Amino acid sequence: MIEVSINMQTKLSEHFTLAELCKTSYITSGGNIPSRVAIENLKRICENWLEDLRYGYNTLYGQRGVTREGQSPCNSVAELPAHRGDSPCVSPDIPIVITSGFRSEEVNRMCGGAKGSNHLTGCAVDIRCYGPEHMIRMAGILLDIADGTKRDFDELILEQRGTTYWIHFAVRPKDNRRKILFDCR
């Protein structure tokens, strides 16, 4: 058997590492190691979506001093007045927390994931939300990004189990369905 070594501290984008998008609490024989193609898919989600989501959310609801090169693709952010450094309303920069990204077949089976899950190819992430309002705001920003950039996504699923909220967000290299669902139990 050939042993493969991957640097899990590799940055997929400015604020996201490979380790963040491959972490799991499930112990498996083969680990949770993505293929090169899965890493490229994760990188695309981070660069094209999660960085924009982080910027958009923080511009609207977090620290107004957050900066980023280029204009925001988020329509809600583009309409905001420019930040003034003397603003009394400055809160800390709020990170986007990924609870699940890439899943090996073994991890996917153990966590009860769907057989054809986008997580298996690195095309999906689950984004932690801190309640229904936070979840709806994050989903709205993702939709604004899609509209502002004319990029498509495969799935935007707002999920709830008891008091736990998250967004399942998937982007495939092609054949995206723009499927939007609520799955609250």
Model-derived regions, located:
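Extracytoplasmic cell-surface/polysaccharide-interacting catalytic and binding patches
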Residues: 1-67, 72-79, 83, 87-91, ...
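Glycine-rich, flexible loop/turn motifs
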Residues: 8, 12-14, 29, 98, ...
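Amphipathic alpha-helical interface surfaces
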Residues: 46-49, 107, 123, 134, ...
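Surface-exposed patches in mature extracellular/periplasmic domains of secreted proteins
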Residues: 93-100, 153-158
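Short, surface-exposed glycine/acidic/tryptophan-bearing loops
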Residues: 102-125
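Catalytic cores and adjacent binding grooves of peptidoglycan-active enzymes
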Residues: 116, 121, 129-185
